[in-house]
Amino acid sequence: YLFSYMKLFKRSKKEGSKKRPWRFIILGAIICYLFIAAINVGIEYTSSDEYCQSCHVHTESDAAWKLSTHYDNGSGVVVHCVDCHLPPKGEGYLWAKIKHGSKDAYGMMFKDTNKINWQAKSDPDIAIDFTYMNSCQKCHSNLFPSTLSDDGGDAHLHYHNNLATITCLNCHITVGHFDENNVHAHNT
C-alpha cells in the first residue's frame, strides 16, 4: 500500500520535474491537517470531566463538585473541570493543561494521596494556583446582575476596587467544590 504512494513521487520522464514539488506540498498539507486534527481530538478527549477524574489525585473532588452550584443549579448549566482549572483558550490554555496534567499524573504515580492536606489547599491563597480568575470572568463578566443582593453588590464593588489584593476565591471558595463547613449561601 505504501509503495503505491511512493510511485507518486517517482520522477517520470513524461511529467518532468516541475510537477513534483506540488505533490510534496499537497502531501505536506494533508499530513499537517491530519496532525492538527489528531491534536485537537486529543485535547478534547483529555478535557472531559471523566478524563480529569481518571487520574486526579484528589479523590473527593468529583463528589464535592457534584454538590456545588457549578454542577447542581437552577439554570442547568454545568461548569466543567477545565472551565475553572485552566485559563480560557488562547490565554495559555495548552501550557496550563500540560503543566497541571503532568503534576496530577506525577502525584498519582509517586505520591501518597492520603498524606496530602486537601483542606489546606482550599485556602484562597493556595487555591489561586489551581483556579484562574480569567476563567471566572469569562462566565461572570457582569459583576452586578439585576438579581444580585445589596450585600453581593457591596462585596463586588469592594472586589472591583481592590483587584490587586482580592480574588473571586476570597468569597466564592466553595462554589466549584462544595464544603459543608464553609457555606455562605448568599455568596454563591
Annotated model-derived regions:
Residues 5-188:
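Short sequence/structural segments immediately N-terminal
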